[in-house]
Design a protein with these regions (language model features):
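Short, conserved micro-motifs composed of acidic
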Residues: 27-296
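Bacterial N-terminal signal peptides
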Residues: 10-20
Length: 296
């Protein structure tokens, strides 16, 4: 199949019903057979590298976003194929090796994507095309599972939005699409989360020179926010000012990033930046962003 690039609303609408997901977990062998962090990958430098080729970034499928647990021992990501739609996969570091990616229990039957683990490691949020409770806003909708003594709880509805991100202080950010049918645009918003439920949205005063912001990624220390435009391309960063306002967005394509890159997320320590490009996940040293503070 041909690689897909990023995702759009029409793409996500096509992921509602899944059939035969087994092919999406194809891997060489039963475990990755590696003992290093980040699924055994050597950390990248200042030039982007393909992340975990053959394990996460697979030539036969499309991968877009993922999330690491705060201690780095778990990784969740989603994979898409033309035949089977989208499934949420995870790998764990167990007894010195990373396990082969497998589907998250309880999510089969509906497209699942854009996972995010909270910094307290107690909640896993993911967009899911499962029907929402009566009277609640629907697509795109987030659901959450709470960590238990034996794994994860049953999924529960969280609220509407796309591409959740959070920092160490427990502040969450999301793509607010609640008025899209009225103004045909998206917003980046701070969202209050209580017991896995989205209770309030506060739109941020961040506006790129063109397009509408989406897919926010807050840094672990909350000092900068990455986002993209045009449905998953053209990455920008906005640095937080001392007074708490957000600075003018910086176009990362002016600093060497491919304009087709989008869907950014960071390692829990902020050392590495991940992003989607041409249907795969790439990563690069996070200082490429930090170094822009002195320039911009």
């Amino acid at each position: 199949m041909s690689k897909q690039i990023g995702y759009t609303i029409s793409t996500l609408l096509g992921l509602t019903i899944l059939v035969g997901c087994a092919d999406l977990t194809v891997l060489p062998g039963t475990t990755s057979q590696v003992s290093l962090p980040y699924l055994g990958q050597e950390p990248p430098g200042m030039e982007p590298e393909l992340f975990a080729p053959g394990i996460v970034s697979h030539p036969d499928f499309t991968e877009y976003s993922g999330t690491f647990s705060p201690d780095g021992s778990e990784y969740y990501f989603y994979r898409v194929s033309d035949a089977s739609g989208s499934i949420l996969l995870f790998s764990k570091f167990v007894e010195g090796d990373w396990t082969a990616p497998e589907q998250l229990a309880g999510t089969a039957g509906y497209g699942a994507y854009a996972p995010h683990l909270s910094f307290d490691n107690q909640w896993l949020f993911f967009a899911w095309n499962h029907p929402v409770p009566p009277g609640e806003p629907g697509f795109p909708a987030y659901f959450a599972v709470e960590r238990t003594g034996t794994g994860w709880s049953e999924p529960r509805y969280s609220g509407q939005g796309m591409f959740l991100s959070s920092d160490r202080d427990g502040e969450f950010f999301i793509t607010d699409m609640s008025s899209r049918e009225l103004d045909d645009r998206t917003y980046v918003a701070k969202v209050t989360v209580s017991d896995g439920l989205f209770t309030n949205y506060e739109r941020l005063d961040i506006q790129p020179p063109w397009g509408y912001p989406a897919h926010p990624c807050i840094s672990p220390d909350g000092s900068y926010l990455l986002f993209d435009v045009d449905g998953g391309s053209y990455l920008f960063v906005s640095f937080k000012n001392p007074d708490g306002t957000w600075g003018v967005p910086v176009d990362l394509t002016s600093h060497g990033f491919d304009p087709r890159a989008g869907g950014a997320y960071l390692s829990p320590d902020g050392k590495y930046l991940f992003f989607a490009l041409l249907g795969d996940i790439w990563w690069v040293d996070g200082s490429v962003i930090e170094n822009l503070r002195a320039v911009e």
